[in-house]
Amino acid sequence: MDCYKREIETLLRSREVSGFQLLDLQDYTGQGTALVGVLNAMMENKGLISAEKWREFCAGTVVLGEFASFTGMMGEDIRFDVQISECDPEKRHTRIRCTLMDGERELYACDVTPGARQGRLTDAVSVTFPAECYRDAMQERITGLTVVLTLEDGTRNHYPIWLIPPIDIRITREGIEKDGRMVAFVSAEEKADGAAIVVPSAEGQLPAEYCTDFWCYPMFRSISESMGKPVPVGTMGLSIDTASPLLKRFAQEDYTTPAWYAILQTAHVQRLPADIHPAVQMIDNTERCARLGILYQQDGVWHLTARLWEKPDDPTVRALAWSLWEALK
């Protein structure tokens, strides 16, 4: 649903398009089996999202937030822009309520006046939440908060964000070092002596990329093969065991969030036997249906396919490294 939201909101922010078409709102059983719908083939809700949440970003009136990043450092102000997409030419809006929430607890709120309207879309207006407003919500781990935008008629939208504490940690090709203690990166299980994590070779493996299956993987695979083009990766996003001790200080959602984006850019997926249940795995398409691991335990040794040393200064990479170090030191 996050991919749908991003796609639709990108279109709504553009003054160059007058509308869009979803292909399709329901699962489609022709041209292969396309399980792409928010609804099933009988037009019933599949439980992925409620109708109310769907209409936050797909409706005649949508209040839009635009963020440079959905992750940030604790102690920094939260900055974003707001706009309104309004299809009714007679309807006018006078206020956007911007609220920062920690679960059900309101941390900060302010009102802004919408920008000048040109056609369907208003001009963007900048909003800043000062760092002091969320200080009481901070934890010794990545902290998830929510920005809620509300119009005077009750129209609302929301955006999860993740704030990362400063971490005194060193990430190199050799391993993760903190407080004089090292968790080593090794290339094979037989080298995993003491505090170590195996980083297997990416040779012959799929990259840790994914794209929502907007249609049908077998059809696009066969088209790519017939045209001599690269075959789509065909993976569908992460499934995460949030109870894993290795993720105690990291993001606690059981699906892909922006906290994982930089990490996945350094990773591949490892084909595994079906009896291994990874802490972090990539969901495969229904045709290939392989067990694809990113963080998993095999023969009593933890493996991680992400090469964290490639992005040692990225805050989310450092946060994951900290969580791994805490569990394995």
Task: Give the role of each language-model region.
Residues 27-34, 101, 107, 205-207, ...:
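Flexible loop/turn segments at secondary-structure boundaries
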Residues 221-315:
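Catalytic beta-strand/loop cores that center a nucleophilic Ser/Cys/Thr
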Residues 1-94, 278:
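Substrate-binding clefts and catalytic carboxylate motifs of secreted carbohydrate-active enzymes
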Residues 179-222, 230, 302, 327:
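Short alpha-beta junction capping motif
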Residues 76-115, 122-129, 141-152:
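Beta-strand-rich binding/interaction modules
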Residues 42-56, 146-167:
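Short, structured interface segments
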Residues 161-185:
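Low-complexity, Pro/Ser/Thr- and charge-rich linker/hinge segments at domain boundaries
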